[in-house]
């Protein structure tokens, strides 16, 4: 979505990708960027970490977006670029554990963005600005905009488990969340072409579904949006499909959920989008 919104800056834009391959490269190509416009490092895992895994040790969390921030800053300096443009949304600010400020997506949050910018100002300041273009929007608004670009449907991918094979595993909370989000705007035939099956017609995803939707249930530790966005998407998906509903939609409809508030006019003013990148032409309508 960011690449499409910034089309008028195409000639001066580079795509920064760590370990460029598969879906990331294909999306860049669809946006009109050939190999000469794709830059980024190769990232490898220390063999010692793999050996510890073999010994039974668990992996810690990798704040990948923080890795992107610091490494992209180096590339921006080397290539003489003024802006590092991310695509993190307002929804990434929501915490994951009820009653506690625990955010699995901290390195995608406004808090991290502010912290990183402060660090740059204090230690590295040379005019390079790091910001997220999509921060003012909810992920629901981004999805609404994304579906207007069907050329990306065959190539985009956002599943951690399927990242190495450029596929949707269609068996995790992230896949279910994206399926729900898009179900507000797309029919099941189109969604099945993307995911390989109708995820809303699977009883085994009840617990994951409830974690994404219900208050009092902790959200899955995946990069997913807010429960308000999920409820709005489900409401729209149910209206779109009429009386013939897949299992999870039918189950949810029986709870008689209240009509959710529209997010069409949502706009998070706590953002660092600079001028001349004006938001007057970036509304999600």
Report residues per predicted region:
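Short flanking/linker segments adjacent to small metal-binding domains or redox-active Cys/His motifs
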Residues: 216-260
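Immediate flanking context of iron-sulfur cluster ligation sites
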Residues: 148-167
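Conserved small/polar residues in nucleotide/adenosyl-binding loops
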Residues: 280-285
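Local cysteine-cluster metal-coordination motifs and their immediate loop/turn environment
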Residues: 165-177
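Predominantly late transmembrane helices and immediately cytosolic-facing juxtamembrane segments
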Residues: 160, 204-210
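ATP-dependent adenylation/nucleotidyltransferase module used to activate substrates
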Residues: 1-151, 178
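Active/binding-pocket-proximal capping segment
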Residues: 161-163, 191-202
């Amino acid at each position: 979505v960011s690449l499409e919104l910034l089309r008028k800056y195409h000639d001066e834009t580079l795509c920064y990708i760590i370990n460029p391959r598969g879906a990331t490269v294909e999306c860049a190509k669809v946006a009109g960027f050939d190999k000469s416009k794709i830059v980024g490092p190769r990232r490898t895992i220390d063999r010692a970490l793999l050996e510890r895994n073999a010994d039974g040790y668990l992996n810690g969390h990798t704040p990948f977006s923080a890795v992107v921030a610091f490494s992209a800053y180096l590339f921006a300096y080397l290539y003489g670029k003024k802006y590092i443009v991310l695509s993190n949304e307002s929804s990434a600010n929501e915490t994951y554990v009820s009653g506690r400020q625990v955010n699995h997506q901290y390195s995608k949050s406004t808090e991290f963005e502010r912290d990183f910018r402060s660090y740059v100002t204090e230690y590295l300041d040379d005019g390079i600005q790091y910001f997220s273009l999509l921060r003012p929007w909810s992920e629901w608004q981004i999805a609404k905009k994304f579906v207007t670009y069907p050329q990306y449907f065959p190539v985009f991918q956002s599943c951690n488990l399927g990242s190495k094979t450029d596929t949707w595993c269609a068996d995790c909370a992230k896949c279910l969340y994206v399926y729900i989000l898009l179900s507000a705007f797309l029919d099941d035939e189109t969604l099945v072409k993307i995911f390989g099956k109708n995820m809303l017609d699977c009883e085994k995803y009840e617990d994951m579904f409830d974690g994404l939707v219900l208050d009092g249930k902790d959200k899955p530790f995946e990069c997913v949006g807010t429960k308000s966005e999920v409820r709005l998407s489900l409401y729209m998906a149910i209206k779109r499909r009429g009386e013939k509903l897949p299992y999870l939609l039918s189950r949810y409809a029986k709870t008689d959920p209240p009509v959710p508030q529209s997010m069409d006019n949502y706009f998070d003013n706590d953002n660092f989008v600079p001028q001349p990148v004006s938001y007057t032409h970036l509304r999600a309508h």
